[in-house]
Amino acid sequence: MKISLRKSRDSGTVAPTRRRKWNWKTISIAGAIIAVLLLLFVLFQPRSLPRMGDAAMPDFGVSTSPGAIKGTVALASSTQLSAARQEVAGLERVAATDVLELFVNKSTAEAAVIDLRSAAVWWTNPQDRDQDGMASPLIKGKLGAQLSLTYLMPNGQTKDYDSFNDSVIHKTFTIQSEPDGMTVVYEFGNPERGAEAIPLKISKQRLEEKILNKLDQKDRNQMLTRFRLNEDTGIYERREIPKSALKKVLDLIEKAGYNEEDLKSDNEQNGVVEGEGGGSASFTVPLRYKLDGEHLLVSVDASAIKSQPTYRLHTLDVLSSFGAAGKKENGYLFVPDGSGSLIYFNNGKNYAQGLVLPVYGEDPSFFKTEQLNTYETVRMPIYGMKRGTSSFLAVIEDGDAMSTLYADVSGRQHEYNWIGPQFTVLPKDKVMLNAREELIKTPAEPYAEQLQIRYMFQNREEAGYSGMANAYRDYLMRKYQLKPLREQADKPADAPFYVEAIGSISKVKTFLGVSYDSPVPLTTFDEAGQMVKELAARGVFNIQMNYAGWMNGGIQHKLPNNVKAVRELGGRDGLNRLREQLQAQGGTLYPEFSLGRVYNDDGWNATKDSVQSLGRISLKFFRFNAANFKKNVEAFSHSLLSPALYPTVMSRYLEHAELLADDGVSVQDSGSEIYSNFNLNEPILRQKSIAFVSKALKQAADRGKVMLQGGNAYVLPYASQIIRAPMQSNRFQITDEMIPFYSMVMHGLIPYAGEAFNGVENQDVNKRMLQAVETGSNVFFSWLAASTEQLRDTMWDDFFAAEYSQWLDEAASAYRQLNELHHKVGDAFMIKHERLADEVVQTTYSNGMRVIVNYGNAPVQVGGAAVEAANYRIEEGSK
């Protein structure tokens, strides 16, 4: 189905006329006509949506730091602590709390943290890297770096520096002590003089006066060969100097007494900016360490980074080697791809690609012509590592939307298992000039705010991914003041049953040979009410209905400048009847709309209001062909609205939705997608978009209940319900085990469900139910009432398995079983998850309940009792 954007109105042209004599009457009439034409032009010109000012992150009223020490602290034995301090002998202690001590090596800038509760020592860099038989000297140096960066050359190519090879060995770093930590300031680049010390441009008079007249004839001739005279300007311009001759020319410059003051004067006189004269790139980057109670904070103030105009900082890796574990260590890396995965140390999977995971997924504002894989998104900006009986969880607190996680195992370039983030300080993209030529483009300004990582440490029985999940849940509760379900007085007794009702789509029809879009009702409001009745008759309660395609033209709706329920579905009265029916059953109606995705050009100015790429093109997105992975330009999907307009659009939607009396709102895209806007008039980097999303969602949450999809971490303070949360990982080759980390964090905080049971590749309801038992998620189906014959000749093949009459009985059966489990653990925290065998897992809850799931085809014995094949068992326990 092809959807064409209606073009903006044209103001027209005026045909040439013959000269004539004008009188006052003619002038008056002409003036009136012009005024009318101008009025019509203003009325029908596409208007840019009004902005609602800048956006700042909401204040959640957090009174204590997330790192504040909780309860009584049990320290390690004096013997253990003595051994730990012996390990850091020769280092200087720079800060301490009741549970952590921070040390620094003043010769190498390496840092170490001692956890006094276990005597575990966490190093920023592996201490035995010199014994690595696989690593080259350069790689050993990189293992000793706390920071690594890439920068852009004038031609768009990238080069890299690391803090060991390009700062520490040159002794161009300083350590500044602070009450709660320290800041290490690195000067990147070769401190020795290079071509930049030779003037790029110099007047004939000054070349003779400052250099040539102070040299003998032989040296003067040598120097003159390095410049060419521009006869038009009378300026000498430096030639390219080969490396073999550079030292000789520098010696002559020094011999003549030409100094930095002279160079600065010549540069200013001839318009040469710093760095334009060549030489090595140089950067100044401050890295701050701070102890915050139980946690270590590591940050870089991007606004304090200094660079040359010629060389621009592109990416920055922060503590990639923190905790790096060697070949003799036991443990794993935790990566948050989708539900979560573990990578066992030294797993030998060097045939597999190392892990590269953009936090919150890829930025859709970048140029893309094909889509090879659709993968589970990183919803939480976290990563971790378990070593022996200790572990850490790292939370990317600031700069999370600009970050990408990297992880790999030993055996590729060196003998260490490692994980860490890379921050894209200055995004770049390819812009095609023609079929063969491309140009690298960047925004005018880089990201200039904080980049911050918070390290949380776990020990003994809390060490591992279960302890990491408990720590992150506690962190979210403190940061966002989230109230557990068990403390919410109005929480329902029954488990939620999530159903997505598909309302109206558009279908191309013809009349007298003219094509037009016609609304096709798939589920009317009354038919959705019938779904509710039939579910209730089968023992399904607490129905949470996400109603998609209910307004302004259906699924691909117009912007909510005005909100009208689709007449073919039953209009406003039908919608309100459905809402009242759901409320009477103890459920909630969530009419869905898209905040950022725009499906047609009504109600906005596509030039001013849409997201632009770095090539200054207003982006349009198309569906991809599943056969060849290429973009299908005949299948338009959507455009993107500038994030700056989110609060305006939300305000308008809520204003009109109030008239429809709905008590919930479902936002289709904001919980799962975040992007930049490179519009020159209003550039917005991805990190700033989070503030606009938060401002808009807070408006909705202040008014009532909010259902979101995907569940990115920054939307959690505003979510009442989450659907399409990640229930599985990507199963990348390098990973070894899939874990329900997302669920472990969320259970007991916000009710959630994964993908619709009938919307996944494997539609075995029993298997989906078993996965829901393991992950603590709820039943979710995406349904329509009409026959799927209505979907023929449309792009909506996603809905071919959605006829609700075919799923009712299985859905109700799955719900009744999960509701029984919900009554036992629905508001409890999921405090432990473990794999007992290949296809047997056990989940433990904060109220002592345990749930064992057997995915296998044969019964298994656990704790002296059988768990039947493809089944589960609930065990009572003590808290």
Regions found by a protein language model. Name each.
Residues 109-110, 119, 190-192, 304-306, ...:
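Solvent-exposed loop/turn segments at secondary-structure junctions
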